[in-house]
Amino acid sequence: MASLNPSAKELHLLYVLTDSNLPTGGFVSSSGLESFAKHGFLSSQYSYTPKEFKDGVLGKKNMTGGLVDFARAEVSNYASTTGGFVMDGWTCVNDSRKASKAGNGIIEDEVQRVLQKIQALDKYHECTLLSHVGRRSSKAQGVAMLTLFSRGLSRPVGIDEYLNEDGGGPGSTDELGVKIVEGYKKMVILEKAPGHLAVCWGVITAALGLPVDRALHLHLFLHARSLLSSAVRLNIIGPYASSQLLLHPYRDIINQEVEKLSNCTTGIIEDKAEKCGEEEDLWAWTEDAEKGPATTWPLGEVLMGRHDIQHSRIFNS
């Protein structure tokens, strides 16, 4: 859990990760916004949400209001489908780092054990994404994040005399964390793991020492910001309107979803040892299903799946 008063190192790491110049691959994806707009839902004369009823008549909406409605539905769906994977990916690496610092086990053995969990988590994420468009976008951004860690977030070579780091705290990467990320990247290159963004983000933020709640919040913030960047590139709104939306209505949307993710999990990396000896419950699978990822906006998934049939398009999703 993050401190209410983050350290200077943690703040600096957050500033680095929120830099819009970082090559994260997010510019290739509109998260379904392009297809949503092309199918006429965003530019419809009347609002499509029940909340806009006035005296039994749907009220007119402007483009910025449509983007807020879109973000409310899309960010909620994104949080529900990816939050558990960020949490579990982060937990795998963080628990391993704690065990390593306590002197438990050999690093190479620990790395392989964690990589097996990450591989299973990543393959499960592949199964939960409903369209080939969503999978393609997630993998492209995941690979970009792994590359960013290796080339842009690792310690620079040859300037140790200029660094004043004690090897701990947010932003520092220990040997185990680096080996896990590099091992995961190798699995993705060898096509032994898909390399989805949510899993990559959880693994990388844990390796950097970022608290999990900040990792989840930043995960949704960057996603919401990319929606607005896509809207600007699609000429739906201008850059000033984008900043207004991100500062005001999107803040509440993000905070609401972050609160829901406080105990999120996929349920597939839990330690089952404590359940041994207990009588098997016929309906135990329903509890696991409730914990796992879920699609909350089917319309958005359908429209994203139709992205490739557009006659012209800017983004790959």
From Swiss-Prot:
Keywords: Chaperone, Nickel insertion, Virulence. URE4, URE6 and URE7 may form a complex that acts as a GTP-hydrolysis-dependent molecular chaperone, activating the urease apoprotein URE1. This is Urease accessory protein 6. Urease accessory protein required for the maturation and activation of urease via the functional incorporation of the urease nickel metallocenter. Plays a role in host brain invasion. Belongs to the UreF family. One of its GO terms (molecular function) is nickel cation binding. It holds the Pfam family UreF. Signal peptide: none annotated. The gene is URE6. It comes from the Eukaryota. Disulfide bonds: none annotated. Disruption phenotype: Fails to grow on agar media with urea as the sole nitrogen source. Leads to the inactivation of the URE1 urease and reduces the efficacy of brain invasion in mice.
